[in-house]
């Protein structure tokens, strides 16, 4: 059963395991975590890709980008949307590296099929959204409210106006290439990595309160995250999820 999970996830034959790390990878990571039914394999791909991309380990990045696309769990256009969402929350240099890997592994997948990778299409300017700045900012404010379930910040700093309202919520969160739920999963993993208390509270809480993620799914995301980025960071996510869910259920009971 475990070997079958490895084949399905990594799209490769299992290797011999000798060290404690290798044995734990087989028995715990694939035998327990990846095989759990609480999330789809695609959902787990998003958490894993976020973690390995942030960890800067070249081989795991290559392995998981390749496997995600070869398996068909994530198509190439979705991988590129992931890169953009990831870059927003974990930084442009890391995003640049993952995009380079995506290009290489996309070509590899096609090469293994005996095909030439098709040329990249030029993206239309219209895909950038509204170029009326006032309309864009208003739409960004609304998207911020829809995603975070709180009031939008004032347009009083470059970070808020140009960054949060114009770009992150005025454009990225509105792009059609991924569902809001996909972006929630990626973002929760990113803020867990980044260690910033307010974004962790905001994104974990709003993912649960919106209903985009159930508490059971959030628990599974946190377990999967802990396997790829560490139990201490996951502990903070778990505490935040517990506190957020207690507040949500308390409010529901009062209504």
Placement of each model-derived feature along the sequence:
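Acidic, glycine/proline-rich low-complexity segments that act as flexible tails and inter-domain linkers
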Residues: 1-42, 54-55, 63, 70, ...
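Phosphate/ribose-phosphate-bearing ligand recognition and processing surfaces
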Residues: 88
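Short, structured motif recognition centered on aromatic/hydrophobic residues
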Residues: 44-52, 82-83, 183-191, 221-222
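N-terminal alpha-helical segment
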Residues: 26, 43, 61, 79, ...
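Short, thiol/selenol-centered motifs that function as redox-active sites or metal-ligating centers
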Residues: 53-60, 192-199
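A cross-kingdom feature marking solvent-exposed beta-strand/loop segments within repeated
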Residues: 35, 39, 48-49, 60-85, ...
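Long compositionally biased, domain-poor regions of proteins
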Residues: 93, 164-170, 194-205, 217-236
């Amino acid at each position: 059963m475990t070997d079958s999970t490895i084949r399905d996830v990594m799209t490769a034959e299992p290797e011999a395991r000798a060290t404690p790390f290798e044995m734990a990878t087989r028995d715990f990571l694939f035998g327990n975590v990846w095989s759990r039914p609480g999330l789809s394999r695609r959902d787990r791909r998003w958490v894993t890709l976020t973690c390995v991309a942030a960890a800067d380990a070249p081989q795991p990045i290559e392995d998981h980008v390749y496997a995600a696309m070869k398996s068909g769990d994530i198509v190439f256009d979705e991988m590129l949307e992931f890169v953009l969402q990831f870059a927003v929350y974990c930084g442009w240099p890391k995003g640049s590296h993952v995009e380079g890997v995506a290009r290489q592994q996309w070509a590899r997948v096609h090469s293994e099929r005996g095909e030439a990778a098709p040329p990249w299409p030029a993206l239309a300017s219209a895909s950038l959204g509204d170029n009326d700045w006032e309309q864009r900012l208003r739409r960004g404010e609304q998207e911020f409210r829809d995603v975070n379930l709180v009031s939008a910040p004032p347009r009083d700093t470059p970070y808020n106006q140009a960054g949060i309202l114009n770009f992150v919520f005025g454009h990225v969160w509105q792009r059609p290439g991924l569902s809001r739920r996909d972006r929630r999963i990626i973002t929760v993993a990113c803020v867990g990595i980044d260690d910033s208390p307010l974004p962790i509270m905001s994104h974990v809480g709003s993912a649960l309160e919106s209903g985009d993620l159930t508490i059971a799914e959030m628990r599974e995301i946190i377990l999967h995250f802990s396997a790829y980025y560490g139990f201490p960071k996951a502990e903070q996510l778990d505490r935040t999820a517990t506190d957020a869910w207690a507040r949500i259920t308390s409010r529901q009971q009062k209504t």
